[in-house]
């Protein structure tokens, strides 16, 4: 799977970031897709950019999305769509009382548009990209909206309430839709020669990576209405710094650079995640 960065969030300085514009992907989508053939890639992740699509509440402009869909169909590319990739309309944050209703409205409008344009075709969506990361970024370290500190759990809870409601609305409109979660896959470890408390803290932090999908599947917070049926495919992101030592800010080096017995092979991380949910797994870029 290939991917084109589609984040549209407010950065730490309150300025809107639009990576589809910054990378010129929209202007070069024809050649971007043609270049995939060199690598035998025919599936890509894209994003609709919520902040662009819904500039007025409940009024949706999918004109750019339709152009992207048309180009994909012309070249035989399967798109996987992020509905929310870090960005929200200017009048919304995850903690706003209208957030869930607005997100459900967006999900329904997107599915209805797709069905009208391409009836009977397969649609794969990630409702909200990396809930684990964006709830930390916006809720704990003031990196984006709502610019909070010690609000990470509250932001995550609000995002997952909207996520679940959005999935239910989409599956009602299109029972054959595929829901692909996308979360970071990490390994959080204690320092060497650590105390038992350090080990417990690291273990708890490691398990926190699963909270979002646990909520989606109703293993946590069942009051939000999650269910295993709401998840079809497990998607993970994995980067060079996805294994770190708790409380230090230090990342483990790749195993082939400087072996550390605490390093966990990526294959083992994937196996652990699969055994937790027993869903097909996709590595997303």
Sequence positions of predicted segments:
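Non-catalytic scaffold segments within catalytic domains of secreted glycoside hydrolases
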Residues: 1-27, 33, 37-39, 53-285
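Active-site gating/metal-coordination segments in enzymes
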Residues: 45-48
């Amino acid at each position: 799977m290939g991917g084109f960065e589609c984040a549209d969030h407010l950065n730490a300085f309150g300025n809107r970031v639009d990576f589809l514009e910054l990378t010129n992907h929209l202007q070069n989508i024809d050649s971007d897709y043609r270049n995939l053939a060199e690598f035998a890639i025919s599936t890509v992740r894209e994003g609709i950019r919520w902040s662009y699509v819904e500039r007025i509440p409940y009024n949706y402009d999918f004109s750019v999305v339709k152009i992207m869909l048309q180009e994909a169909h012309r070249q035989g590319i399967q798109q996987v769509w992020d509905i929310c990739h870090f960005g929200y309309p200017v009048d919304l944050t995850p903690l706003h009382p209208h957030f869930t209703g607005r997100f459900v409205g967006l999900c329904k409008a997107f599915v209805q548009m797709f069905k009208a344009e391409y009836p009977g075709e397969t649609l794969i969506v990630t409702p909200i990209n990396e809930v684990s990361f964006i709830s930390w970024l916006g809720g704990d370290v003031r990196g984006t909206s709502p610019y909070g500190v010690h609000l990470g759990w509250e932001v995550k809870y609000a995002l997952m309430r909207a996520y679940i409601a959005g999935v239910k609305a989409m599956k009602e409109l299109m029972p054959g839709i595929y829901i692909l979660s996308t979360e970071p896959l990490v390994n959080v470890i204690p320092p060497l020669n650590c105390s038992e408390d350090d080990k417990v803290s690291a273990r708890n932090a490691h398990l926190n990576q699963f909270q979002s999908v646990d909520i989606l599947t109703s293993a946590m917070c069942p009051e939000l209405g999650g269910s295993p049926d709401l998840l079809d495919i497990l998607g993970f992101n994995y980067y060079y710094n996805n294994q770190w030592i708790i409380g230090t800010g230090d990342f483990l080096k790749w195993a082939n650079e400087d072996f550390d017995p605490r390093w966990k092979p990526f294959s083992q991380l994937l196996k652990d995640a699969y055994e937790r949910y027993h869903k097909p797994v996709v590595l997303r870029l």
